[in-house]
């Protein structure tokens, strides 16, 4: 199993991208590490609010993936330089000031990958 240092994973999150949208909240990820795959979203936590895979969508290269559809059998190719928008629906989670972001995703080579970041939100 490949181990990816946390400081590298943190670079995937695009600082300043966290924003409230009509259906919930969105943020942007950019693969700055190298070609790879996302084989699942276990959960996304913003502040104290947890979004399960059913509440998560990932949009990249014009394709929309529901969090429950992404798996080891049905992974998302996430190439170097590729950008994706992660949308979490159904819950209000943003606060004024700094918001804490924790994403637990799966990668076929590295297993569970944790992305931890902080950001202030933009209005919709």
Identify the residue ranges that each predicted region occupies.
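Terminal leader/tail segments of proteins
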Residues: 1-46, 50-124
């Amino acid at each position: 199993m490949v181990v990816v240092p946390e400081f590298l994973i943190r670079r995937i999150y695009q600082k300043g991208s966290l924003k409230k949208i009509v259906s919930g909240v969105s943020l942007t990820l950019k693969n700055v590490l190298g070609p790879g795959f996302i084989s699942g979203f276990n959960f996304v936590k913003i502040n104290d609010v947890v979004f399960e895979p059913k509440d998560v969508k990932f949009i990249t290269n014009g394709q929309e993936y529901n969090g429950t559809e992404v798996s080891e059998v049905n992974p998302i190719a996430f190439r170097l330089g590729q950008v994706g928008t992660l949308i979490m629906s159904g819950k209000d989670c943003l606060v004024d000031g700094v918001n804490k972001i924790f994403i637990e995703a799966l990668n076929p080579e590295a297993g569970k990958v944790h992305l931890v970041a902080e950001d202030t939100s933009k209005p919709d």
